[in-house]
């Protein structure tokens, strides 16, 4: 039963008034089905439920004083579903860089928020004996953050990353409810790397064993890297909604990140090269929904729809001047080598001249600035497009003395818009 950001008070009010305020999301024959305008009473009566999970809204999860109606809600559910076991879902702390409006309630400190959530969840379990099990997803996520994935379990600073983030929470539910050790379980979505599957499963397992404290995943501090040399190109897809399958790496958040993501090459091998969003991006672009399903092939690379439809934005107001830069850091490059960078920027359903993005690379030296007019108006324009015009290519780029190259993205004020963006990035060794 879904309402975005819904707290216990609203759930209880909806229960009392039998308000048709929910989207009822259900998995039917392997497919998620959503029904709008549902009542709690309808959802509770729809199945002979074995388990019913409750939780507080994320920003209030660490504030037990906001749980005042929990006893009433439990009693109401037990009256309608007396045989169901009730679960309490311990939510996770926000990313350290989160801009969520509730984060300052915890001094914008991840560990303060985590500790508060653990304390409140345990108090709920102690004070409400009808709660049968605690699902320690918050601890599982915090465990995962001790691995080489770092503080990269949220796509926007508070919602879970949609592949391994959600999978970690799912593994926690599985082991807690079934009692079966999830480590080694053969099921995982194909979009998750096998090394990351191990992190998610171990993070969940240790959370079930120790739900109120963080377990340091000492065996997962860095990925297994077969060769420190970059043998094959690297493809990076930026954007929140359409994840690209192997061989693409996905960066879903525009938020400043304190964690470097380890990157795989097109042969599906981890490299020692890392990427992170430094600062300056203001939003993400999810696409418009009417994009052609066709890939874009340019510069010898096939960019699937999932790579070119969405991206990261640096956005301002028209007639107020250029905006940016948004900055992305590529790190741990070989200082003795040179690299080629190809940036793709497409804004579907936009006039070609309305949005102009400019790009500069800063390594051992600063590159020349390159501009891309990013708009493609419609499917006919897409079919006729010369996609060479939608890339910015930088060759023989040398990293700085620390092995870093910074990608800078600006939006030029055209009078129609001031918006820069990046959809995808390809990196290869210069020949």
PLM-predicted stretches and their roles:
Residues 328, 349-368:
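Short, surface-exposed beta-strand/strand-loop-strand elements in extracellular ectodomains
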Residues 59, 94-115:
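Serine-dependent acyl-ester chemistry module
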Residues 331-334, 396-398:
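Short, flexible loop/turn segments at beta-strand junctions in immunoglobulin-like
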Residues 226-320, 382-431:
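Low-complexity, Gly/Ser/Thr/Pro- and Asn/Asp-enriched, turn/coil-prone segments
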Residues 105-207:
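Catalytic His-Asp segment of secreted/periplasmic serine-dependent ester chemistry enzymes
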Residues 1-70:
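Conserved SGNH/GDSL esterase-like catalytic core that processes O-acyl groups on lipids
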Residues 335-350:
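A short beta-strand element within beta-rich, extracytoplasmic domains
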């Amino acid at each position: 039963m879904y309402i975005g950001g819904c707290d216990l008070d609203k759930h209880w009010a909806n229960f009392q008034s039998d308000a048709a305020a929910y989207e009822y999301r259900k998995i039917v024959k392997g497919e998620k089905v959503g029904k709008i305008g549902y009542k709690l009473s309808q959802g509770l009566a729809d199945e002979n439920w074995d388990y019913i999970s409750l939780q507080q809204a994320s920003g209030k999860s660490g504030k037990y004083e906001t749980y005042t109606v929990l006893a009433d809600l439990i009693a109401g559910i037990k009256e309608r579903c007396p045989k169901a076991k009730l679960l309490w879902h311990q939510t996770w702390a926000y990313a350290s860089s989160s801009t969520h409006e509730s984060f300052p309630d915890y001094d914008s400190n991840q560990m303060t928020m985590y500790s508060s959530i653990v304390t409140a969840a345990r108090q709920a379990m102690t004070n409400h004996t009808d709660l049968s099990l605690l699902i320690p997803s918050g601890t599982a996520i915090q465990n995962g953050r001790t691995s080489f994935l770092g503080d990269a379990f949220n796509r926007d600073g508070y919602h879970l990353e949609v592949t391994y983030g959600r999978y970690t929470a799912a593994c926690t539910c599985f082991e807690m409810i079934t009692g079966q050790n999830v480590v080694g379980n053969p099921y995982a979505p194909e979009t998750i790397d096998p090394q990351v599957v191990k992190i998610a499963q171990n993070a969940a397992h240790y959370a079930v064993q120790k739900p109120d404290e963080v377990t340091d995943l000492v065996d997962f501090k860095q990925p297994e890297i077969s060769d420190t040399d970059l043998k094959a190109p690297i493809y990076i897809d930026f954007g929140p909604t359409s994840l690209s399958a192997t061989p693409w790496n996905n960066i879903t958040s525009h938020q400043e990140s304190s964690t470097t993501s380890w990157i795989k090459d097109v042969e599906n091998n981890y490299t020692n090269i890392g990427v992170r969003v430094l600062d300056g991006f203001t939003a993400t672009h999810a696409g418009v929904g009417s994009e052609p399903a066709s890939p874009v092939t340019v510069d010898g690379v096939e960019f699937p729809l999932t790579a070119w439809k969405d991206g990261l934005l640096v956005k301002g107001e028209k007639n107020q001047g250029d905006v940016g830069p948004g900055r992305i850091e590529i790190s741990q490059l070989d200082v003795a080598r040179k690299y080629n960078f190809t940036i793709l920027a497409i804004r579907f359903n936009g006039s070609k001249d309305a949005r102009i993005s400019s790009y500069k690379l800063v390594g051992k030296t600063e590159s020349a600035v390159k501009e891309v007019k990013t708009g493609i108006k419609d499917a006919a324009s897409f079919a006729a497009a010369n996609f060479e015009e939608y890339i910015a290519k930088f060759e023989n780029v040398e990293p700085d003395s620390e092995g870093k190259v910074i990608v800078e993205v600006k939006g030029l004020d055209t009078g129609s818009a001031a918006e820069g963006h990046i959809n995808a990035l390809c990196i290869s060794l210069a020949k």
